[in-house]
């Protein structure tokens, strides 16, 4: 899986932080924005990780090798065209130039075969080019509503598809976001960005861009198409081949081009949260481009991305680190002061597992401080269950480090202790699952608990025990899947905790489908 998983946790934190800092200029697709009407009404809700006043037969594990639609594949060798990208006269050589030529050649060949099977019409190649933009390039980039596109324009958007001239431009500058992604995660990330922009070219040809849809809807489909192409690359079906690391890098890239936390994703230019974008990418990767074509009429569900109140906005959706349960009816509890009782009430009362015993969270500084003769694995990652004591031991130094990282936060810890509670639920249910299968069920069950704290139209799902006070903040689910990436197995064949792709997929199954999706 991604190279960031193959290094130490602190190196992962540093890498994700570095990428996040450079991701402020999230790619906005010019033509998509220009051809879409604004939508002011939204069903998204304002959320808070703080407590709110008292006033949902097969395991979810999915092998990330895409298998749903292998019929749409090119078996003939793909010719890599030397002019597939308009590099211009003064382009500095990049290590990934040949890879991108192969990517664009492969995308053209793939859509030449795939588009007619989905839409019943022949594929029309781009009327314009795929342009590399860089500071040294002469002023020869076509405009999108203007006579010319400047390099400063491209830097703002990172990459875009323009329907007016039917062309794509990407930032090839040495100091741009794409160069940073390639340096940190590999050139596959730029290939996925170009596959996303090709997705908008598909929408231009299929008439989707004429429907005045919310931007987030068309972005979701483009993410899905990018995932479908990445699945093709992972199957080694074309001119580009992806490794586990490349696929994992794609997941991280989707996280890094999410909407800012607190932004209504239905606002003009909205692309969706990291959880939304990763989910669309995975849907395409696993199920293929036909699945993506249906997302316009039947979009994937979106998680809310707006703050609940000014206080939540001020703390950026992060509850204070600590264990104090606060005062009844007053929103002053610390993180574990409301997460622990919420987990116990969910499993013991709302789910009502027979024989459930509430768990206690005990913070310790090192594993030697855990007085348990049957401590389960997980302490190194942050939390581990002691079944004989009905106790979850929290690795407080690791937990505090995660909490303080800019790209993680409070719900990284909610996810980690949620896994321990999910394991206790499997024990109480008498589950006989083992190994990776069992761990992925824990991911799914944790997602099912998370589903119960996501408001729908500003109301938490019912029925629920009235003493439960947890509710997610925008960005919380992104923090959870970031954490899944750093604790997951390095490759798909390790089969211990599940690869990052598998863990995120299982977690998402629980969030979307509830406990019934987990097969526990």
Model-derived segments and spans:
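Bacterial signal peptide processing site
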Residues: 27-30
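Catalytic zinc-binding patch centered on the HExxH motif and its immediate surroundings
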Residues: 135-169, 365-393
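Short pre-active-site segment immediately N-terminal to the catalytic Zn-binding motif
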Residues: 174-192, 210-214, 396-415, 430-437
């Amino acid at each position: 899986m991604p190279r960031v998983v193959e290094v130490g946790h602190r190196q992962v934190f540093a890498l994700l932080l570095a990428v996040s800092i450079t991701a402020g200029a999230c790619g906005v697709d010019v033509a998509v924005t220009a051809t879409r009407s604004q939508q002011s009404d939204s069903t998204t809700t304002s959320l808070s990780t703080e407590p709110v006043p008292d006033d949902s037969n097969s395991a979810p594990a999915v092998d990330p090798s895409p298998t749903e639609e292998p019929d749409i594949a090119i078996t003939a060798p793909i010719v890599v065209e030397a002019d597939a990208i308009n590099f211009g006269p003064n382009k500095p050589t990049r290590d990934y130039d040949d890879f991108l030529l192969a990517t664009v050649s492969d995308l053209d060949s793939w859509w030449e075969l795939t588009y007619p099977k989905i839409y019943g019409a022949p594929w029309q190649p781009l009327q314009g080019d795929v342009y590399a933009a860089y500071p040294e390039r002469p002023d020869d980039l076509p405009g999108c509503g203007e006579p010319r596109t400047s390099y400063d324009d491209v830097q703002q958007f990172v990459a875009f598809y323009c329907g007016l001239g039917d062309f794509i431009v990407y930032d090839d500058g040495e100091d741009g976001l794409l160069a940073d992604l390639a340096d940190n995660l590999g050139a596959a990330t730029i290939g996925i960005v170009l596959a996303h922009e090709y997705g908008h070219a598909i929408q231009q040809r299929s008439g989707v861009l004429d429907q005045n849809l919310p931007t987030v809807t068309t972005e979701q489909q483009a993410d899905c198409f990018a995932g479908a192409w990445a699945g093709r690359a992972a199957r080694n079906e074309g001119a580009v081949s992806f490794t586990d690391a490349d696929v994992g890098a794609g997941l991280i890239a989707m996280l890094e081009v999410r909407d800012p936390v607190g932004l209504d994703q239905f606002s003009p230019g909205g692309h969706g949260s990291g959880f939304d974008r990763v989910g669309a990418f995975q849907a395409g990767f696993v199920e293929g481009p036909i699945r993506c074509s249906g997302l316009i009429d039947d979009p994937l569900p979106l998680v809310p991305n707006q703050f609940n109140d000014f206080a939540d906005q001020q703390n950026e959706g992060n509850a204070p680190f600590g264990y104090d349960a606060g005062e009844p009816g007053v929103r002053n509890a610390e993180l574990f002061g409301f997460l622990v009782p919420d987990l116990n009430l969910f499993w013991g009362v709302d789910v009502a597992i027979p024989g459930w015993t509430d768990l206690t969270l005990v913070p310790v500084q090192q594993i030697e401080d855990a007085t348990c003769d049957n401590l389960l694995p997980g302490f190194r990652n942050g939390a581990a269950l002691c079944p004989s004591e009905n106790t979850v031991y929290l690795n407080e130094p690791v937990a505090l480090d995660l909490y303080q990282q800019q790209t993680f936060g409070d719900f990284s810890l909610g996810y980690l202790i949620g896994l321990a509670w999910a394991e206790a639920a499997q024990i109480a249910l008498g589950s006989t699952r083992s190994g990776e299968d069992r761990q992925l069920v824990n991911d799914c069950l944790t997602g099912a608990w998370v589903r119960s704290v996501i408001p729908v139209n500003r109301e938490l799902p019912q029925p629920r025990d009235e003493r439960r006070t947890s509710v997610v903040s925008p960005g919380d689910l992104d923090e959870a899947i970031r954490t899944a990436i750093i604790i997951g197995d390095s490759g798909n064949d390790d089969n211990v905790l599940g690869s990052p792709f598998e863990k995120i997929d299982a977690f998402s199954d629980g969030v979307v489908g509830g406990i019934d999706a987990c097969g526990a």
